[in-house]
Amino acid sequence: EHPFDGSWGYQTTGYFSVTSRYGDPADFAAFVNACHRMGIGVIMDFVPVHFAANGDALANFDGTHLYEYDSDVGHSEWGTCNFNYYRREVCSFLNSAAALWMDVYHCDGIRMDAISRALYWQGNPNRGVNEGAVTFLRNLNHGLNERWPTGIYTAEDSTNFLKVTAPTRYDGIGFDYKWDMGWMHDTLDYFATPFGERPDAYHKLTFSMQYFYNELYLLALSHDEVVHGKKTIIDKLWGTYEEKCAQLRTLYFYMYTHPGKKLNFMGLSLIHISEPTRHLRIS
């Protein structure tokens, strides 16, 4: 559950509560079951890095910094509070919250948001590795894979941190996939390049294969790329409307023949011209 619509749910207050915007827990369970009957898996978007700073939630829970750090790393760039992974009770809380969606609601996997902000202090490699976060994520994935080995566990991570998708038995963090943010940026940059300049930009289409086998990647054209004035995917492309339609078909063909799993934000395959508004996202 989350109080601020504009956060899209990423400023969480209730880690064990499905948002009431769509109904009650029984409604969500019915939704998952209906998806399964149609052969559709359900992957939850989980936020184990930071939480809403609201006074009626986890922040200063008992009058002290119980869940968050008591230092300059206690707050994120979004004004939220960062979880303190050096407290066992905090790690236990997050482990239990993640397990709830798999155990009670029978979801098929978990996508974990903003993992780069956990691996490094404040997401900044120059500040060093947050060893507490690494240990927490490794233990979380190990536990999830032991109890639900067929689940899909994915990291949104834009860093060069090694072994994010390596098994925990090989000292990896244990995710099944990580988002290939580099592929996404390079590909969209290439297709936004004027036609006459593209011969000098081919490296943007080939560079991803130079590092692709370092991790198990998922190619994502996500919600983050079609909001806040970034334009929809088709509107990012160079040319007239007819040329953009042809290029979009080419972009998707390239995406689906490129190694790696695939993810498209809802509506992108329908050639939406305008960005989804907050009210459409809620509806």
Residue map of PLM features:
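Substrate-binding/active-site clefts of carbohydrate-active enzymes
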Residues: 1-107, 111-129
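Conserved alpha/beta catalytic core and glycan-binding cleft of carbohydrate-active enzymes
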Residues: 106-108, 120-271
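Single conserved hydrophobic/aromatic residue that forms the stacking wall/gate
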Residues: 271-283
